[in-house]
Each structure stands twice: as C-alpha cells, then as structure tokens.
C-alpha cells in the first residue's frame, strides 16, 4: 500500500548490517539525525547558531519526534525528505538566489512524494512566497526571479518522482499483467486521491489535530500561549521568515484537517518548521517565570510517573502484575522495567532540583534524553518479545516441533517476521473465507505434519474443538494452533466470517 522507497532503504541497510533487529530501524534513526541537522542548518542560515541550537533541542524534546525516530515506520523518512525539501526551498527563497539548493529542494519533494504521497507538501511554501508584498523584493532577490524559479519546479519535481515512477512506467509499458496494473492503480489513485477525499478508515472530526498537538507535541505545546501572540506580532510586521514557516505550517494543517481520514502522524512534517519558527523566541521565553514553571512541572510529572509505575512493579502491586498477565508477560521479565522506571524518576527529580526552576530548559533536555534512554535500553528489550510476537511464535515453533510445516491464516506481518521457519500463507488481504478455501486442502495433504496458526475469531465452528490449542495472546489478539487433523473436507468457513485480515490501508 506504499511505494517501495522506504523498503528499498531497509533492504539497503540490511545489506550493510545483516541483522534485521538493527537494520530495519536504521532508516528511521538516520532520517531522525538528518532531520535534526537540517533543522539546525535552516535556523542557522535564517538566524544565528544560538537560535539553531534552540531549534534542534526544541525538536528533540517533543514526544512525537522521539517516538517516530525509534520506530521502523515510513513517517520519519518522509519527514527527513520534507525537511530536506524545505531546506533547499527556503535557502533559495529567503537567502537566494541559490539554484542548486532550489533544485535539490524540488527533487527531494518528488522523492518524498513517491515515498509517501504527501511528500509534495513543501511546495505549498510557494503560495505565501508569491503573496509577499513587493516591499520585500529588495531583501529577497529570488522573489524578483520568480519566473525562472517556477520554470524549474516541474522538471526537478518530476525527476524526483522518477526514482520510482520511471521503473514503474517502463514495467507497465512492457507488461499486460493485470496484477501489476492493479498494483499501480492502487498506489497512484486509491491510496492517494481516493484515500484523501473519501477515507474509508481513521475518520476523525475536523478539530482532531488540536488533540494531537495537545498530547504528542508535549512539552512544546505548553508554550503556545506565549508563542502565538509573539508569532502574530512578527507576522504583522511581515517578517518573511515567519510568514513562510508559519503560513506553510497552517496550510499543511488545513490540508490534513480537510480530509475525513486523519492520523496523528500526518501533521508530523510540520514539526521541524514550527520548532524553527519558535527557536528565536525561546531564549526570552525561558526567562519568564510562567514558562519555567510549566516546563519544570512537566519534568516533575514524568519523574513522579516513573517512580509510581516503577515502584508498583518493584513492589509486586496487584495492578502491575495484572497488567502483565493480561499481556501474556512473564512477571520475572517485568522486574527490570520497574528499576529502569525508578531510575528515570530519580533523574527527573535530580534534574529539577539542580535547575531550581531557573534552568528549566536544560532540565527538560536531560529528562528527554533519560526518557528515550530508558525507553530504548530498559523498556523495549523487556516488552519486545511480547509486543513483537517473537515470544508467541517461539511457543508455536516449540509446540509443533522442528520437522512440522506451518501455515498462517488471518495473520499479521509480525507473525510472519518472527516465525522460526518458512511459512505457507493463503493471502493477506483475502477474506477469511477465501483463505480457508485454500488452507483446508493444504492441511488435508499432510494432516499429521502440517499445522495452522490462526486468529481465534477466524476459526469456523466446524473445526474440531477438542484439537484446538490456545497458543497465546499478542497485541490484544488471541491465537490458536490447529493440527491438520482438526479440519475435515466438509468444513467450510461461512460467508459471515469473511472479514479482511489486514484492513485496507492500515499501514500508514
């Protein structure tokens, strides 16, 4: 459901580091580092090195940035490309003319578009740029060269999209394969225009992104009562740097708000631009008592939460152990999590005490670094076997033995990734009924050596109940293991059971 650019990057990193637990995370990590550097360089060129440092640290401390940098998802790579595009465009528009940067920015927008369809968004910055009053032309030489600038937009952008559209077009030209043409139609039309205008999932109200900003953009959103009036004053003065950064951010917000389908990651590309726009104001804001109090309170809240959760785990309180049991976790594996969380709380309290409310910004950076260190070194190694299905699939392998063949029905991608042997599947987006139509005969061919791993609610009533094995739970899904002898020729899944296993468009 996505063009292959992100998968190309993961395959390339696997060639460099042939160990999937590391390789599949590297594109996001490298994209996060690139985004931080680009944010720093844009702010440095538009203001000063001190402002650039504030911009980078502001971006680093926002929760959504850390979460996306640590996930093997496409969105961090997309944001690196949109930020690279803005870097090139703003260098030309505000500090140009710089034709190489301009061409690179347009090319990056094209590559971003074939990475995820909204990669063209940086081009929206051209709208406020064209709307700038003529009085700014004297300080913006590139504005007087708008005709030449526009002439490069389409060729450079199309060149970027040709990274994937070129090979795809050649393949379509030389092939009559209906599956290839359906693949192209799915990506070029259904997953773009149709998905935007007539979203079939994740339907949210118009104001949904205000909720996202108020939560995932902590602690930066706490400063909005001070930032918004300051930004407005600079917009009224017509400072082109603020006009382009803020107007572009508003256009992106409106673009996504207008679509009925909304997810929290959609507005992530705005974040670096807003951090750059906030950076020149942060030195002054951090001298204000109210700002320091809010940021100190945020650090203390994280510290208290860490101590409370960690203490509950370390003391074997009922709510902590009950949560672990519900997720299928072994209680012994939970204990290190408790100590890491207690350590996080101690760091937060120490940072707050050291700052004494006067160095709230520094305490926040220290706490953020501690948070992601604990998350990466303490929490995820303990939780990963259960959240990634590796523990579940290990049990499956042990139960069926090394010589058995394994099939999957109504499966998730992580089940396939964590399986200890080659797996036979019967479709991913196919209905359960269609999958059973193929899985049943497959089991019947070797009923004593073939097993089926299946989502519990996808098992039809005609499967022998006595032979069903409840093998475990993962990510709030219950799974069963069925030997080939549990199926018989007259067992057919009812049409009412035919649901999509991979819900269309889930991979965002």
Q: Where do the model's predicted regions map?
A:
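Specific aromatic-rich, kink-prone transmembrane helix
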Residues: 38, 78-95, 274-277
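Membrane-interface transmembrane helices that cradle and orient dolichyl/undecaprenyl
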Residues: 45-46, 85-104, 112, 282-285
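Short hydrophobic/aromatic helix or loop-helix immediately within or flanking a transmembrane segment
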Residues: 1-22, 112
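Transmembrane-helix motifs of polytopic, lipid-linked glycan transferases
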Residues: 26-46, 84
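Transmembrane-helix signature of polytopic, membrane-embedded enzymes
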Residues: 39-61
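Membrane-embedded architecture of ER/inner-membrane glycosylation machinery
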Residues: 103, 230-508
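Transmembrane-lumen/periplasm boundary regions of multi-pass, lipid-linked membrane glycan transferases
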Residues: 107-108, 115, 120-263, 280, ...
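Short acidic/glycine- and proline-prone juxtamembrane loop motifs at membrane-interface regions
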Residues: 25-28, 67-78
